[in-house]
From Swiss-Prot:
Protein name according to UniProt: Putative pyruvate, phosphate dikinase regulatory protein
GO MF term list: ADP binding; ATP binding; phosphotransferase activity, phosphate group as acceptor; protein serine/threonine kinase activity
Catalytic activity: N(tele)-phospho-L-histidyl/L-threonyl-[pyruvate, phosphate dikinase] + ADP = N(tele)-phospho-L-histidyl/O-phospho-L-threonyl-[pyruvate, phosphate dikinase] + AMP + H(+); N(tele)-phospho-L-histidyl/O-phospho-L-threonyl-[pyruvate, phosphate dikinase] + phosphate + H(+) = N(tele)-phospho-L-histidyl/L-threonyl-[pyruvate, phosphate dikinase] + diphosphate
A Pfam family hit: Kinase-PPPase
Amino acid sequence: MRNKAVLDLHLVSDSTCETVIAVARSAVEHFKSLEVNEFVWSLVGSKRQVDKVMLNINPERHNLIMYTVVDDDLRKYLKEKATAQSVRCIPVLAHVIREISCYLQVTKDPNAHPHKLGDEYFNRIDAINYTISHDDGQNLWDIDQADIIIVGVSRTSKSPTSIYLAYRGYRVVNIPLVCSVQLPVDPATIADKLVVGLTIDADRLIQIRRNRLISMKHQENCNYVSYEQVVEEINEMKKICAKNRWPTIDVTQKSVEEIAATIIQFFNRKNNRTGDALY
């Protein structure tokens, strides 16, 4: 069996590193034979901090730097240091910025500072805190502050989807639907909110629940993994969503990212918005 190539990937930014992380991870997904060790260097705003990055690069390994640095002098310094250590250095936005500039015959703003720590950053932190405190039907007293409400039976990816959306700036409440138990919130009070139901194939849900019980070293709960019980739960959830005209998503073959992307589309449609980020 062929060994995987190993790469130390250093992600450098003078801000939060979100852009370079997103680009880098999307890029390495195309190389399944590659094993990547990721090093994140955010808020690198001085030559001294660049020096610290370079000191942590092992010359005995394959290294690559990907970066977003706004300051021209600092960017030049980083490239010089990388060249001196024979490390390849890739600016992830330079090509795109150059193409836009050439196409529109405009120059870039020298004072631009993508993802500067400001309202956007703190709004996102607020969304994450709100979503965590409203996981699994908790603290519904201020559900009116939510942007999105997710409902579904147990083990349908409600929590990870909620957290993913929170990192995109959405305040999310997720509510478990339990068979024969009344919904813990009056649907009339959330009529103006986007409420999305997550459904799943019964056989797949049973498999997920069994794996969950095994991982927690619990004895198999007959009702929890009973086919009849699971089908009843799913059907009851679908009826609740249909009655309240809430859209549903079949998550059987979907990743968390795909589920979240669909929910964002629903949100934009409901609020006559374009784009995919709230903040």
